[in-house]
Amino acid sequence: MKPKIKVENLTKYFGDKKVLDEISFEVYEGEIFGLLGHNGAGKTTTLRILAGIIEEYTGYVEVNGKIGYLPEERGLYRDEKVVDVLKFFGELAGMKKEEIAKSIDYWLNKLKISNYKYSKIKELSKGNQQKVQFIVSVIHNPDIVILDEPFSGLDVVNVRLLRDIIFELKEEGKTIILSTHQLEKIERLCDRVLILKKGKAVHYGKIEDICRKMAYIEYLDNGKLIKKEIPYEEAVLILKEKAEDVIKFEVRYSLEDLFLDE
């Protein structure tokens, strides 16, 4: 299968500072791919290169498909109405008027902000402004959706809403590549990840192949409810010893060990 995104030995300098150091990865159709790392790891620079915003670099970058991009810096026309901003970006993408109108209504309803259609951007909460910015990235029905820190500034309810929408995009065959520095956001979302440290790729592959296997277990111990997350092997022993008293057993994966030296 031909990858939707192919990157080989990507290197980028800002002045004398090397911010990306020969990173390589591939992303396939219908995949949710994550870039994970602390601030300054090189995530945003990588996504800006994929989106065509940064053009000067060394290495090979191939992107096969129409792109939608949610930047880390949320920049919308604050004095404009939501509907006018979305119309502008739809027109910029070459959409017909009927397509734009239909897409606007669909996404405003999907993200539960249809009541703000005629509100000015500056009148919206930061969370709702971010939802509008997300719509900008998908209004033109792109093949590839690039999301830089998509959950930043959202409350728990809206994080879940956006996660569900990302999963739906995947089911439609869209390719999604997103960045985050929050482990819990990526462990249960991405099919594969690239973990960056100071511009270098330190791990690349499926979550279960690069993470420490853990388990969350709830059980009764002499009538007392115990809840804890422990290494998988330890949890299995408890499960065997207290099978009748185990209330919940859930396999999880931890990436924490990868960041201990940061």
UniProtKB/Swiss-Prot annotation:
Native source organism of the sequence: Methanocaldococcus jannaschii (strain ATCC 43067 / DSM 2661 / JAL-1 / JCM 10045 / NBRC 100440)
Superkingdom, taxonomy of origin: Archaea
Listed name of the protein: Uncharacterized ABC transporter ATP-binding protein MJ1023
SUPFAM superfamilies per record: P-loop containing nucleoside triphosphate hydrolases
Positions that bind ATP: G37, H38, N39, G40, A41, G42, K43, T44
Similarity annotation: Belongs to the ABC transporter superfamily.
Gene Ontology terms for molecular function: ATP binding; ATP hydrolysis activity
Keyword Ion transport: no
Lineage, highest ranks first: Archaea, Methanobacteriati, Methanobacteriota, Methanomada group, Methanococci
Keywords: ATP-binding, Nucleotide-binding, Transport
InterPro entries membership: AAA+_ATPase, ABC_transporter-like_ATP-bd, ABC_transporter-like_CS, ABC_transporter_ATP-binding, P-loop_NTPase
Domain ABC transporter: 5-223
Repeat among keywords: no
